[in-house]
Amino acid sequence: MVIMVLNLTASCSLKPNQASLLPEKAFFASSSFQKQRQELVGLYPIQLNGKMGYMDFTGQVAIAPQFDYADRFVEGLAQVKINNKWGFINPAGSIVIKPQFDETDRFSEGLALVGIKDRWGFIDKTGKLTIPIQFDFASKFSQGRAIAMTKKGVGFIDPTGKLVIEPTYFEAKDFSEGLAGVRILKTGFPYDCCVDPNFWGFVDRSGKEVIPLQFRLVDDFSEGLAAVSIDGKMGYIDQKGKMVIEPHFDYAGSFSEGLAIIKIKEKWGYINRKGKMVIEPQFDNASYFSEGLAGVYIDRKSGYIDPTGRLVIKAQFDSALPFIQGLAEVRVGDREGYIDPSGKYVWSSQNKKFSRLRKK
């Protein structure tokens, strides 16, 4: 997640990242969600007659549709919406944290971000408010740190709510592999968000600047490398800030399962950690690899390739999300559902009158 101060006198309009059925050509999921994949429960959100519930891996209803919205389970709990308020349920479908918040985010490291009247704090899994609702905005915890925005700027807090990195930044990204991207303006604070944006660098968990602010864009560290932008091209640095894959890509994404998406002349392909082109740029869009498959966009349709670049699930979907615990969410016209790695539908709105919703 990236948090940016837009205007110190106005409330931030950004909301916590939620998983949803992405629009056509939209493949990319946040790196923070990638990190949480191993903590997901094997239940999948579905909808029936305007209410949402859950199916299991086989496509059978596990929790009867009864919620206005239902999110994926993470760390054993899932966000649900009832009568315009948000709370949490367990895998049995029982409400364990009463719907009472205007906004929530998924649990991460035992705490969940919650919002009331455009202010943010954190609760534990009992629903106890462990960090008072006080911040203009915040992010979920990652490696013991959460981004927190105050009227002074953007900094980081620890799980007790203590500011451990002062709010002196204009933008910040979640910690990943011990480092977090930060950005500050030469013009200082306060400032106009439309002035020259200066550069990004990286700090460690103590707030020490370990990679100087020198890049126009940065991504999170993943598998030891981070994509960065210099002079309009993207390459990769290591955790010491050394450029190990030269910046000659129009776009470069995070590494996942040993490969990273890159873009050259409007086409997308994949490189390995040595910078070698493993799958030549040939796709109109592409996603990160998850469970051995990656979504790609060909001639206005989405399908899936394996790590050799072979198309193993025909490009036939209007949108296709990454595989998570053996299933992927796809859409064809009004038909939405989940497929297995063979491309077979496990569940479909066409024959079960179910559909997915976006979180509003």
Range-by-range predicted roles:
Residues 1-4:
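Sec-dependent N-terminal signal peptides
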Residues 21-360:
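Residue-level detector of conserved, function-critical positions
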Residues 13-15:
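Bacterial signal peptide processing site
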Residues 9-11:
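C-terminal motif of bacterial Sec signal peptides marking the signal peptidase cleavage site
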